[in-house]
């Protein structure tokens, strides 16, 4: 594939092109890259010819097809046109696995090629209910997604407890209470009330970092923004039993937002850096912003517990860069 991404990456490397995936290249830069791709593919094609001979593989190399030739390109465009007309090729917005280095999304099969163990933050923080003097204890492994936070999820069928800790009332998943208290080394606490997750539905909360993110503060004025939602996918066996939902960075989160007509706030560019819409976090690569967000939570008295968690996480099979889940407008070839 002369213009395949692996070939383009190799050509960029040989040409000394950095950040070559950007769309603001000049016409001459595009021509140079195309020429570099042709040179690269022909160089390695000769090596593959020799490998075929060494393995005793008989192929008609004189009749090889090249993807940069007009007859191939025209046939591909014809097929794509037909797919679009038949509704097979569609354009839409979805959460995809995205490589910040290659600047491209990956398919499910590509994502499954690159899982490895990583250490991520395990962050417990608290948010105050707007109309009650109570705090939701929320868990996340990706602090940067607090910038795009829209909802907090509970499981409708599971039990949650209101717990008095010193002068505050915390709301946490019942089966997670004991472990959370042990992690915090809290022995003196009192369970005041037990409720189902469904009973917390619709309660509005105050995001602790709104002063840092003015655009998010505007979204927060909407009635269906920064509210508790009860959804069956919420896992009460990890964290605090409550999870924050970021439609810009999670598939379940996104689907929940679409179902509930919640607007999606996504101040993240193609390089996976926060844009001006992210306020004080503007310009940060999203994962680099994790530490600053933790510090800001701590300064506001909203950080409950910080730790680390080791888990499997996907990386790009081409460049080994950790992927980021982003809501993006993409083209999809529908197979079912």
What would you call each of these model-derived segments?
Residues 1-167, 246-259, 263-278, 304-336:
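N-terminal, positively charged nucleic-acid-binding surface of large information/translation enzymes
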Residues 21-24, 60, 193-199, 284-285:
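Short, solvent-exposed coil/turn linker segments
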Residues 25-28, 141, 172, 200, ...:
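Short coil/turn linker and secondary-structure boundary residues
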Residues 148-269:
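Catalytic alpha/beta core of large soluble enzyme barrels
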Residues 200-202, 280-291:
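A glycine-biased structural micro-motif
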Residues 288-313:
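Phosphate/diphosphate-binding loops
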């Amino acid at each position: 594939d002369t213009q395949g991404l692996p070939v383009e990456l190799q050509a960029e490397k040989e040409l000394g092109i950095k950040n070559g995936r950007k769309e603001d290249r000049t016409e001459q830069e595009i021509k140079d890259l195309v020429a570099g791709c042709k040179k690269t593919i022909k160089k390695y094609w000769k090596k593959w010819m020799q490998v075929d001979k060494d393995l005793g593989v008989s192929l008609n190399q004189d009749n090889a097809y090249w993807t940069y030739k007009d007859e191939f390109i025209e046939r591909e465009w014809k097929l794509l046109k037909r797919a679009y007309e038949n509704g097979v090729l569609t354009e839409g917005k979805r959460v995809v696995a995205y490589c910040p280095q290659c600047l491209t999304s990956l398919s499910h099969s590509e994502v499954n090629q690159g899982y490895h163990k990583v250490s991520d933050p395990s962050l417990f923080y608290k948010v105050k209910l707007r109309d009650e003097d109570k705090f939701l204890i929320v868990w996340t492994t990706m602090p940067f997604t607090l910038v795009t936070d829209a909802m907090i999820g509970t499981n409708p069928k599971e039990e949650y407890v209101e717990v008095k800790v010193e002068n505050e009332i915390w709301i946490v998943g019942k089966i997670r209470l004991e472990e959370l208290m042990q992690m915090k080394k809290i022995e003196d606490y009192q369970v005041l009330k037990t409720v189902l997750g469904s009973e917390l539905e619709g309660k509005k909360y105050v995001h602790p970092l709104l002063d840092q993110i003015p655009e998010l503060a505007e979204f927060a004025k909407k009635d269906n923004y920064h509210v508790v939602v009860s959804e069956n996918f919420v896992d009460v066996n990890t964290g605090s039993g409550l999870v924050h939902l970021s439609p810009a960075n999670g598939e379940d989160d996104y689907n929940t937002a679409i179902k509930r007509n919640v607007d999606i706030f996504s101040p993240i560019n193609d390089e996976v850096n926060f844009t001006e819409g992210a306020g004080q976090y503007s310009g940060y690569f999203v994962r680099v912003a994790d530490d600053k967000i933790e510090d800001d939570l701590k300064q506001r008295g909203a950080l409950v517990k910080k730790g680390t968690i080791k888990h499997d996480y996907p990386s790009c099979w081409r460049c080994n860069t950790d992927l980021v889940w982003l809501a993006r407008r993409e083209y999809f070839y529908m197979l079912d």
